[in-house]
């Protein structure tokens, strides 16, 4: 049953979350998507044609494709069942090939990368460390590690902006690798998101088909990897309206709700514990810093 009446929850005011990223002493660059942010970093830090980067064995295409597109030679390091880095295997890789960079990820805010990064920097301090913090976009204060050279997050994975990603870098990045804004992407994404909002109330299947079609079209645009593009003016203005604390709370509560619905209905198989570990992390507030 829908609620009607004069009593409403409070209007949420912005808390300046993205403005406060400047407090970490990094150069801040906003782009339109996470994969293009990774491409921008990949182009900025690639040294030569023989450059080797290590990626986690558990990662999606949008994490590996930017480095393949920019000509990096890719090797993969192992993860343990709790999604932390297998440090013994990592050391073997470091000893067996000349590694120029490594991409890490703090999965769900519970798979700390601090010790592995310390090992990498002790092995050779010039190895570039890139961390994808998309799972911890609103918890950077909790996980921040000064040894990391580039922090990258897909903002649009966490909040309702039409496009958006952010890079926190130690050095100023080369704008020559950046293209111009393409409004078609952000405009069509904004239309799709508006239709999705309408669908949440109407449950109209035609509206659902329309917004899914628009989103699929837009994803095809960024899959082309022609050039990294900046965040749209529309999305950048949206960031000023964000309350990061409320979003982090809502995401965590949603995950708790998911756990309660699953409630023993999902059978875990030995050696395939990713979902099980994820549910454990979310249920332990002190350990998990989603999103």
Predicted regions and their residues:
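Conserved PLP-binding active-site segment in aminotransferase class I/II-type PLP enzymes
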Residues: 1-49, 97, 226, 234, ...
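PLP-dependent aminotransferase-like
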Residues: 12-27, 36, 42-124, 130, ...
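PLP-dependent aminotransferase class I/II
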Residues: 22-29, 59, 103, 179-291
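Short, solvent-exposed loop/turn segments at secondary-structure junctions
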Residues: 35-37, 59-61, 82, 107-110, ...
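Active-site regions of enzymes building and remodeling cell-envelope glycoconjugates
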Residues: 71-76, 127, 147-152, 264-268, ...
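Glycine-rich, charge-decorated loop segments at or immediately adjacent to ligand/cofactor-binding or catalytic sites
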Residues: 137-145
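Active-site PLP attachment segment
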Residues: 148-199
């Amino acid at each position: 049953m829908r609620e009607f009446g004069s009593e409403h929850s409070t209007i949420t005011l912005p808390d300046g979350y993205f403005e406060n990223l400047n407090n970490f002493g990094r150069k801040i660059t906003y782009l339109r998507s996470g994969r293009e942010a990774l491409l921008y970093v990949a182009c900025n830090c690639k040294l030569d044609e023989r450059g080797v980067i290590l990626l986690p064995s558990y990662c999606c295409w949008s994490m590996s494709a930017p480095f393949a597109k920019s000509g990096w030679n890719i090797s993969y390091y192992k993860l343990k069942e709790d999604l932390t880095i297998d440090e013994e295997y990592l050391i073997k890789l470091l000893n067996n090939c000349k590694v120029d960079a490594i991409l890490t990820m703090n999965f769900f805010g519970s798979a700390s990368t601090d010790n592995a990064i310390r090992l990498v920097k002790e092995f050779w301090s010039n190895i570039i460390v890139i961390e994808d913090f998309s799972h911890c976009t609103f918890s950077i204060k909790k996980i921040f590690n000064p040894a990391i050279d580039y922090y990258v997050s897909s903002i649009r994975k966490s909040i309702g902006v039409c496009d958006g990603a952010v890079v926190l870098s130690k050095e100023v990045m080369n704008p020559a690798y950046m293209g111009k804004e393409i409004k078609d992407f952000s405009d069509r994404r904004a239309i799709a998101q508006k239709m999705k909002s309408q669908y949440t109330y109407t449950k109209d299947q035609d509206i659902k088909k329309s917004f899914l079609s628009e989103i699929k079209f837009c994803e095809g645009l960024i899959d082309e990897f022609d050039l990294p593009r900046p965040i749209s003016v529309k999305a950048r203005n949206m960031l000023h309206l964000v309350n990061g604390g409320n979003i982090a709370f809502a995401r965590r509560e949603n995950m708790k709700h998911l756990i309660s619905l699953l409630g023993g209905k999902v059978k875990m198989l030995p050696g395939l514990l990713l979902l099980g570990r994820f549910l454990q992390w979310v249920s332990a507030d002190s350990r998990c810093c989603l999103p």
